[in-house]
Amino acid sequence: MTVVSVPQREPLVLGGRLAPLGFSSRGYFGALPMVTTAPPPLPRIPDPRALPPTLFLPHFLGGDGPCLTPQPRAPAALPNRSLAVAGGTPRAAPKKRRKKKVRASPAGQLPSRFHQYQQHRPSLEGGRSPATGPSGAQEVPGPAAALAPSPAAAAGTEGASPDLAPLRPAAPGQTPLRKEVLKSKMGKSEKIALPHGQLVHGIHLYEQPKINRQKSKYNLPLTKITSAKRNENNFWQDSVSSDRIQKQEKKPFKNTENIKNSHLKKSAFLTEVSQKENYAGAKFSDPPSPSVLPKPPSHWMGSTVENSNQNRELMAVHLKTLLKVQT
């Protein structure tokens, strides 16, 4: 009779979660004496990828320890070779990724860039393209192959052309003998099998006139509507232009009035200038004329002796009158 207990220093895996370090299996399961006749368990090999047991101690004690995600460890081995997982189930196998189907629109629109990338991305499985069509043929990653066929149109084309058998995918080193090119023609998709030597761009050059004709047919009502709108716009433009012409005809009268006003202003300015010229006051810019200056007394000028006597008498009279000297 042997009683086995898990050591406390090693974390115990319970229900897919890591048990705290202070946890004991005896307190969780109770004192369960287990009688086994099996040989003692082999010593568990330590996992080199496992983290040290003291790493999560501050985190469990409530401190600010490093909150790292614990890596999955092998569960503790029990004597009866059973896992210590309470209600644990084996991990389910990963589900295979299902390829999303492209919704076919009535107008034959292009799929999203993600689907185009998924379709034309080279896979690692022996050079086989992951985006093989419903017939299993290898699609050409070109501009013409970007259009996804609608299921109804694809079924119709497959039923109409039984000659196009599903081609085997070519080896990675070899080039396929035929390439299937998807073409969209006004919302309808067709598959055309071409030999390897023929270029893909030749189809577009050959089919361009037909597409242009169809576009012109569909664009006829649009051109009519646009022409009617243009006629309306021309009518409004004509009316606006006539209004502008009338305004421009009215403008010359205003121009003549402006010219008259400018002439009047110029004449008033000229009269003011002429009046200033007639003013006899002193002008600091021009030298004074001799007629405006006062005449000096005659005795200052060089004169004869006779005039000098008369001037003396006059000066004596002037001085007496100025000084009020009584004679």
Swiss-Prot record:
GO biological process, one term: nuclear-transcribed mRNA catabolic process, nonsense-mediated decay
Effect of P287A: Abolishes the interaction with the nuclear receptors
Tissue and organ expression note: Expressed in liver, lung, fat and NK/T cells.
Biased composition (Pro residues): 287-297
Major localization listed first in the record, in broad terms: nucleus
Paired cysteines (S-S): none
Biased composition (Low complexity): 141-162
Motif (SH3-binding): 285-291
InterPro entries in UniProt: PNRC-like_rgn, PNRC1/2
Record carries keyword Transcription regulation: yes
Keywords on record: Activator, Nucleus, Transcription, Transcription regulation
ATP-binding as UniProt keyword: no
Ranges for region Disordered: 66-175, 280-300
GO CC annotations on file: nucleus; P-body
Domain of life: Eukaryota
Nuclear localization signal, short sequence motif: residues: 94-101
Segments of skewed composition (Basic residues): 93-103
Function per UniProt: Nuclear receptor coactivator. May play a role in signal transduction.
Subunit text: Interacts with many nuclear receptors including AR, ESR1, ESRRA, ESRRG, NR3C1/GR, NR5A1, PGR, TR, RAR and RXR. Interacts with GRB2.
Protein name (database record): Proline-rich nuclear receptor coactivator 1
